[in-house]
A protein has these predicted regions:
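Active-site-adjacent "subsite" loops/lids of carbohydrate-active enzymes
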Residues: 33-61, 109-143, 153-216, 344-355
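Active-site clefts of carbohydrate-active enzymes
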Residues: 42-43, 272-280, 326-353
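Bacterial Sec-dependent signal peptides at the C-terminal "C-region" and cleavage site
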Residues: 13-32
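Catalytic domains of carbohydrate-active enzymes, especially glycoside hydrolases
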Residues: 62-90, 220-226, 300-304
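Aromatic-lined carbohydrate-binding/catalytic grooves of carbohydrate-active enzymes
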Residues: 78-131, 306-308, 315-320
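Acidic-and-aromatic substrate-binding clefts and catalytic sites of carbohydrate-active enzymes
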Residues: 48, 56-58, 86-91, 131, ...
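Hydrophobic faces of well-ordered beta-strands that scaffold small-molecule active sites
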Residues: 38-42, 79-83, 152-154, 227-229, ...
Length: 356
């Protein structure tokens, strides 16, 4: 049985992020977020596929209506709204570095799966509708969030592996840079789903490609209060066992991103925050190439979110992470992911409360 795109993506990544540390957060751009944050991290597919309003190609009015439910006016306690920008796969904004979600070059790129074709073309028409109205899903969502007094972030998936499978035959879903450069893949299948065709960040070309996408977004969206590097989608950066040795390569990427952010902060006259999403232990993070302590030592990051991939974990070791991290001045948040069941079954309110 084919899984729909919505099932594969999980619709919304709900980082129902509960404050773990109430230590000072003077770098925050909003008074409320100095005390705590409740973050909604949305993966964007429910908006672009218009799951809220009948599944027809989306228009800006749909995004405006959709956003009401996400805001304090919609009776939520969410302080911070993050909109995912995608990754190489399922990239939402129009970009000079790749095709946007649903761009099959006017139907010239093949699909092997009719269900994927239908959803991909729906997403593409939604992108074009929004473009014709002078906006896109990121701009429309975050501007609306700002209108309601929310802190706004873009969340970028550092190495998303949805559709990273050439055997599927769905060429329309393959990013050109990824498809044309298999020499930049890990070719290591030991790390789970599609990991063998994941980008290997050992290659400077891969790192530069990612930095180009990040810088493009930072320059394009001037309404943001911050930017998140989501290393958990997916947590494959190097071949198995190479993370600790090659962690300085990722640190340099974080450093360059911070430099771009600081330059833009000076131009725009307000501080733009840099956040990261990483595994639930400091040791586990560096095993994957993520030296979170070094980033904090250098003053590169403003807050950290920890979590697992695609699971609702009731036992995230927040206190141990805080102890091992050693930076009490930097807030640490725990996340609740929206995934876990196939066929698709959402967690109940009680389950969310239990995980929290």
């Amino acid at each position: 049985m084919n899984r729909t795109l919505a099932q594969i993506l999980g619709l919304t990544l709900v980082c129902g992020l509960l404050l773990i540390s109430t230590t000072s957060c003077d770098s925050s751009s909003q008074e409320q977020s100095k005390r705590y944050r409740l973050i909604h991290n949305n993966d964007g597919s429910d908006a672009l596929l218009n799951r809220w309003f009948g599944g027809e190609p989306v228009h800006k009015a749909d995004i405006d209506s959709y956003m009401v439910a996400q805001t304090p006016d919609g009776k939520t306690q969410v302080t911070t709204f993050m909109m995912c920008s995608g990754s190489d796969f399922i990239y939402y904004p129009d970009s000079k570095y790749g095709r946007y979600f649903g761009d099959d070059l006017n139907g010239t790129l093949p699909y092997a799966d009719s269900a994927i074709k239908k959803l991909w073309q729906l997403g593409g028409q939604s992108v074009r509708n929004l473009q014709a109205e002078g906006t896109d899903v990121i701009k429309a969502s975050l501007e609306r969030a700002k209108m309601h007094g929310m802190e706004t972030f873009i969340s970028f998936r550092m190495n998303d592996l949805h559709f990273a499978d050439t055997a599927s035959g769905n060429r329309a879903t393959f990013p050109d840079f990824w498809f044309e450069h298999p020499e930049y893949w890990t070719h290591d299948t030991t790390q789970g789903w599609h990991s063998g065709q994941a980008f290997d960040f050992s290659y400077p070309e891969v790192r530069q490609h990612k930095l180009n996408l990040i810088k493009e977004q930072l320059e394009k969206y001037d309404m943001i209060d911050g930017y998140e590097l989501d290393f958990m989608r997916f947590i494959v950066l190097f071949k198995t066992g190479e993370g600790r040795e090659k962690a300085p390569l990722i640190t340099e990427m974080v450093r360059e991103t911070k430099q771009t952010i600081d330059s833009l902060s000076a131009v725009r006259g307000h501080k733009i925050l840099l956040a990261v999403r990483v595994p639930v232990t400091v040791d586990g993070a560096i095993d994957k190439g993520l030296d979170v302590k070094q980033w904090a030592d250098e003053g590169l990051i403003d807050f950290v979110t920890i979590g697992v991939h695609w699971r609702g974990d009731t036992g995230i070791p927040v206190a141990q992470f805080r102890k091992d991290f050693g930076h009490n001045e930097i807030p640490v948040y725990a996340s609740i992911d929206d995934g876990g069941y196939l066929p698709r079954e959402f967690y109940s309110d009680g389950m969310y409360r239990g995980m929290a």
